[in-house]
């Protein structure tokens, strides 16, 4: 009985696809202004779909009836190369949009790339008051977003996005790698530009999101499939206003009570380049107070912001050894290679760094020399999804953990959750999420909920969240520079004493 039903369904499917093939052939001929006197070729049973140049189009159709799986069919026709991954869904889509409209989606180009500055004054960090989203619009009206770095560079970054966009406008949005190398040839080859790199990164993010949404799949599926359903995170941004050990300890307890089992903080106040005995004593007291407050089962991570010379960094590492920090982040500026070599030879501390790197080739030097234990690529700097995956692959080859730097905004956060889901050597993802102003969370619908120091990986298409256009328009602002004050823009507000 089941066999008869299957055969009947197969005959019906063959007839349906033959008629569909004729319609598509006519549409393709009109779009490409080409004709084929032979007409559509016959339906041929096949076990898989292959891809060829524009003179051949394949449709793969899996017919299902009464729970029976039928052999896939392949319809070979003149025209362009297109794949349909489901039967009824694809047919319904074709019926709704029309053959020509559906095909136009696959021939769309990048029509517009727009940097959008968002702002609302925030109490705990001046850079957290800003976001720079980059909106990519295709010629058929699809929209996606990436995110760029705002710190101290609002106007230069906005200008760089507009300049970098020239390498992408009019191109096929699917050709992400080709667009990257065109950008490299046009805009980057003769200079090392942070602004250009963050502009590229934001556009790359948006194009990957766009491609995944087009396929109806979460981004992690395009990157090989997820390795974990939940991503472990650590808290940052929680210690605003802390200048004494008691404040750090009390707020650290609140972080753990919220559900985190790892947290990062900068205990160094206004120390810069060198550190006095008194400054080191106060920093040590803060670290000791946090360790005592959270116990031995919580990872504490020490943020240096890359601001010490090698001698000071080594002295700090030795003083902090009794408190067992999981890693020491950016004890020196990333350009101080000799300083990192000295630090490695004189301390046993795990080194975390990488947020300032803008290419996989830069990351490679630290990996080859064994100067990093936890590498921290930032998707907003390193080249978006494309650059992040290159660094993650290198990290796996060198048995180095990955912890994506993740400070700027909700689009970056959602995208790096997807990246973290597929990264083999993941340590944790950085999270300011619970300590951002509410508007940043509302920008993507505030979907992430902490449980056991982790967040669930969204299963929706693309990066798994959608930008709320109403919230975006509410906080849209004219590009302007972040004012420079006594307290540097990169610190958590109120900690520079």
Curated annotation (Swiss-Prot):
Marked site (Transition state stabilizer) residue numbers: 430
Cofactor note: Binds 1 Mg(2+) ion per subunit.
GO molecular function, one term: gluconate dehydratase activity
Catalyzed reaction equations: D-gluconate = 2-dehydro-3-deoxy-D-gluconate + H2O
Superkingdom per UniProt: Archaea
Keyword Lyase in record: yes
Key words, A-Z: Carbohydrate metabolism, Lyase, Magnesium, Metal-binding
Pfam entry (one): MR_MLE_N
Sections of the chain in a coiled coil: none
EC number from the UniProt entry: 4.2.1.39
Active site: residue positions: 305 (proton donor), 405 (proton acceptor)
Site description Increases basicity of active site His, residues in chain: 378
GO biological process terms on file: amino acid catabolic process; carbohydrate metabolic process
Needed co-factor(s): Mg(2+)
SMART domains: MR_MLE
Described function: Involved in the degradation of glucose via the Entner-Doudoroff pathway. Catalyzes the dehydration of gluconate to produce 2-keto-3-deoxygluconate (KDG). It is not able to use D-galactonate as substrate.
Protein name: D-gluconate dehydratase
Organism of origin: Thermoproteus tenax
Taxonomic placement: Archaea, Thermoproteota, Thermoprotei, Thermoproteales, Thermoproteaceae
């Amino acid at each position: 009985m089941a066999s008869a039903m299957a055969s009947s369904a197969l005959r019906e499917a063959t007839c349906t696809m033959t008629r569909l093939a004729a319609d598509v052939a006519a549409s393709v001929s009109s779009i490409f202004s080409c004709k084929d006197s032979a007409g559509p070729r016959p339906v041929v049973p096949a076990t898989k779909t292959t891809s060829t140049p524009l003179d051949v189009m394949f449709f793969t159709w899996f017919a299902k009836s009464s729970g029976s799986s039928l052999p896939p069919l392949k319809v070979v026709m003149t025209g362009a190369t297109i794949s349909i991954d489901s039967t009824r869904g694809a047919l319904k889509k074709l019926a709704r949009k029309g053959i020509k409209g559906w095909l136009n989606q696959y021939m769309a180009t990048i029509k517009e790339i727009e940097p959008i500055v968002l702002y609302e004054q925030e109490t705990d960090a001046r850079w957290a008051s800003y976001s720079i989203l980059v909106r990519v619009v295709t010629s058929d009206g699809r929209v996606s977003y990436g995110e760029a770095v705002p710190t101290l560079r609002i106007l230069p970054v906005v200008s760089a996005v507009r300049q970098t966009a020239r390498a992408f406008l009019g191109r096929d949005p699917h050709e992400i790698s080709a667009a990257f190398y065109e950008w490299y040839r046009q805009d980057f080859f003769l200079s090392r530009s942070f602004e250009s790199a963050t502009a590229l990164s934001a556009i790359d993010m948006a194009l990957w999101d766009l491609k995944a949404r087009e396929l109806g799949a979460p981004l992690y599926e395009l990157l090989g499939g997820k390795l974990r359903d939940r991503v472990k995170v650590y808290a940052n941004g929680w210690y605003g206003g802390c200048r004494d050990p008691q404040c750090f300890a009390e707020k650290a307890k609140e972080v753990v009570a919220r559900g985190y089992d790892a947290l990062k903080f900068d205990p160094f106040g206004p120390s810069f380049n060198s550190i006095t005995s008194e400054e080191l004593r106060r920093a040590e007291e803060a670290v000791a107070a946090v360790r005592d407050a959270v116990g031995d089962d919580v990872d504490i991570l020490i943020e240096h912001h890359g601001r010490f010379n090698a001698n000071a960094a080594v002295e700090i590492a030795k003083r902090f050894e009794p408190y067992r920090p999981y890693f020491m982040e950016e004890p020196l500026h990333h350009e101080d290679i000799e300083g990192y070599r000295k630090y490695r030879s004189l301390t046993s501390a795990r080194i975390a760094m990488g947020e300032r790197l803008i290419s996989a080739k830069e990351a490679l030097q630290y990996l080859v020399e064994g100067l990093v234990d936890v590498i921290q690529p930032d998707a907003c700097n390193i080249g978006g999804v494309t650059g992040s995956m290159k660094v993650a692959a290198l990290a796996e080859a060198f048995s180095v953990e990955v912890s994506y730097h993740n400070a700027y905004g909700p689009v970056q956060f959602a995208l790096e959750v997807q990246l973290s889901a597929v990264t083999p050597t993941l340590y944790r993802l950085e999270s300011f999420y619970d300590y951002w102003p509410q508007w940043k969370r509302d920008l993507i619908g505030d979907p992430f909920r902490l449980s056991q120091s982790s967040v669930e990986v969204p299963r929706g298409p693309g990066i798994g969240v959608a930008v709320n256009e109403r919230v975006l328009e509410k906080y849209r602002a004219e590009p302007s520079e972040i004012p420079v004050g006594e307290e540097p823009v990169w610190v958590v507000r109120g900690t520079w004493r």
